[in-house]
Amino acid sequence: MDNYDESRVFFREMCKNNGVDFPYRRGVIMSELHTPCCPVVCKLILPDPLTIDYISKIQQKPFLCIQFCSVLPCLPILEEFEHRSKNETLSRHFVDYEGAITLLTFDELFNKYSKIEDNHFVFHMDSNKYLLNEHTSKKIIDLINPSMAFIPTLSLKHSERKKWSTRKRTRFNDLYQSYYETLLKCSNKTKLVKPIHPCIEHKDMGDFEAIEFPGFGFGESLNERYELIKEMGANLIGKELRIIQLKTGTPLEILHAVLLGFDVVISPYPEILSLQGCALSFELPSEIEDNCEPEYVLNLLNEKCKFIDGVYKDQINDIVDLKNSVYISDVETPMDEKSIMKESRAYVNHLLNCKEMDGNIILSAHNLYMYEMLFQRIRDSIENNTLVSFVHNFVKCNLKED
């Protein structure tokens, strides 16, 4: 895994839009990872079911998002391996991310949100209960040695902002301060990511090169999200790496986040679809022709992305349900013509119905590649100063027919 080298600039802009409300830009992290980008969210401590070699075929620079909750059950093994490695010459690490840039997140992206008991975060995995405090968090960072790590906080959802009591706000801030002071003592060069939140007071806490906007993706409309982010980011100097974690992270949510200036958008959507037996399949506009205003495009995204039954759903054609029986005989059509995975829809349908592991592997690789391709087009359009038009054309060419 890549650690931050003090001789390099952690994040630098390559080109940007000068609009105050729409500060979208292209950049590079640690001289290798081009932004805007989306990491592969690991369901387990490793990016199961794919290997690093597989991910390297999808992403030019592997970028992994690892969850605290997936590391906690492995903590005794990690500690034992670390102890033995000091006394024995071992050929490789127990968890070897092989050149990937890694980001350790507190959010549970595939499960229900965590709770607090006696100042411990509580996770439930495989019917087992795990507790996380600031000292355990520090231990995990020292063992995993990620490139970046979020500071765990009780993430208050902006969709429930009117329900925040003074007691809850104070608890949120105290929890953050406690974790921050402990994690500063980590022995490695992991970059801590500062959360920007109305409940957090940043007093004498130094400069951060990476920031996140927590609490989004839980029912607020995209227009509400825009207004809140604009308010929360009003005092930023603009040089920080900007990160947002989304609970769903659909294509339209991705485009919305990039327009608002986020460099890293964490989305479990490709992996969630893979578990559901669904394949991403959308058109990428080949020609960019129009001069839409950003405000118009934001309203269009708000109209076409709705919060339904606890998740965000795009009102466009972007998903193929390969469990559906209509694909049993579709041996000619790939999941998407643009994909690196050339298996037919009928073949994947067969694998899914037989509960073959290869079905999940093929779908995971396909969906991650589709998102990587979307982000590459986003980066190209920013460089060509056509991002707003690209977003508008993307929505138009994927609209569902009435």
Swiss-Prot record:
Gene Ontology biological-process annotations: tRNA-guanine transglycosylation
Lineage start: Eukaryota, Sar, Alveolata, Apicomplexa, Aconoidasida
Protein name: Queuine tRNA-ribosyltransferase-like protein
Magnesium keyword on record: no
Organism superkingdom: Eukaryota
GO molecular function, one term: glycosyltransferase activity
Family matches, as InterPro entries: Queuine_tRNA-ribosyltrfase, TGT-like_sf, tRNA_ribo_trans-like
Record's keyword terms, sorted: Glycosyltransferase, Transferase
Family: Belongs to the queuine tRNA-ribosyltransferase family.
Gene3D superfamilies: Queuine tRNA-ribosyltransferase-like
